[in-house]
Design a protein with these regions (language model features):
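Short glycine-centered, acidic/aromatic-flanked micro-motifs in structured strand/loop junctions
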Residues: 133-135, 238
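Short, acidic/turn-prone active-site loops that include or flank metal/cofactor-
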Residues: 102-108, 135, 159-162
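The Walker A/P-loop phosphate-binding site
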Residues: 191-253
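A residue-level signal for conserved active-site and pocket-lining positions in enzyme catalytic cores
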Residues: 3, 43, 131, 166, ...
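Short, small/acidic-rich helices and loops at N termini and domain boundaries
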Residues: 1-35, 72-81, 128, 141-201
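Phosphate-handling DNA/RNA-contact segment within nucleic-acid enzymes
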Residues: 23-125, 143
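Short, highly selective alpha-helical patches that border small-molecule cofactor pockets
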Residues: 88, 139, 143-147, 248
Length: 253
């Protein structure tokens, strides 16, 4: 019933092998009813994240940290990285099966992404990696580090406007709107690289109006074909005694 309030169907829970059961939670010191997110690598169960009603979490100590749902990006050239298992379920509801989640959320001032180191080979053939993490400070720090490690040229980013994450966006809007939010992710701006979209207005103005006139020297026949700009280097050439100096003097005046 709780999953229904979060927009998650039984089909999604079954397909992603989410289970429930009793588990001892150290935060409460007793056995609790828990949701169990099962982590698989190569079809083998490698870890389980337990969540109780008080939002306490537990992962098995000593198990190798990996992305949740990592098996489902195999064979794809695109994937989506989110910050929690519930966001993976939300994207699955929107028809996106190739979404993965970091196992332990985002932490401000921590670049320890051992789960990425353990799964780095999965990204070798990815041509597009969409990062759709939370909008808070830890989430944005995680986004920055993922971009740094995976390469800005491959990464795309999206936000959820007035919502914190993908699951909240699904609940407030719809699976269709969530799908649109992901498919319209924007490429990460590359340092010292200008794209057409960056100068679209300037190009449109040039096509419609041509070059803008610079400084002119007052000779109509010349001004119709040439004008100057500040910080421009101009070389004046010609045969001897053709009036080069007089021409330069005219420009200076």
């Amino acid at each position: 019933e709780w999953f229904k309030t979060r927009g998650i169907s039984k089909d999604t829970l079954d397909e992603l092998k989410v289970s429930v059961g009793k588990e001892y939670m150290p935060q409460t010191g007793k056995s609790e009813n828990t949701i169990q997110f099962n982590y698989y690598v190569g079809g083998q169960l490698t870890n389980i994240k337990y969540r109780d009603a008080r939002k306490n979490f537990k992962l098995y100590k000593g198990a190798e940290k990996v992305f949740y749902n990592i098996d489902n990006i195999v064979g794809h050239d695109t994937c989506v990285i989110v910050e929690g298992e519930m966001d993976v379920l939300a994207l699955h509801e929107a028809g996106i099966s190739n979404a993965i989640s970091v196992p332990n959320g985002a932490t401000l001032n921590s670049n320890n992404l051992d789960y990425l180191d353990n799964c780095i080979d999965y990204f070798d053939d990815m041509s597009k990696i969409i990062i759709a993490v939370d909008s808070d400070a830890p989430g944005q720090a995680l986004q920055t580090e993922l971009i740094r490690r995976l390469g800005a040229e491959t990464c795309y980013i999206t936000t959820f406007d007035d919502c914190k994450d993908a699951n909240e966006y699904l609940v407030k809007y719809s699976s269709k709107e969530l799908l649109s939010r992901i498919t319209n992710a924007k490429p990460v701006p590359l340092e010292n690289v200008t794209t057409f979209r960056d100068i679209e207005d300037e190009v449109t103005d040039f096509v419609r109006n041509g070059f803008k006139k610079g400084f002119q020297i007052g000779l109509d026949n010349f001004d119709n074909i040439f004008s100057t700009y500040t910080k421009q280097f101009i070389t004046v050439t010609g045969i001897p005694s053709s009036g080069k100096s007089d021409f330069v003097d005219q420009m200076v005046v």
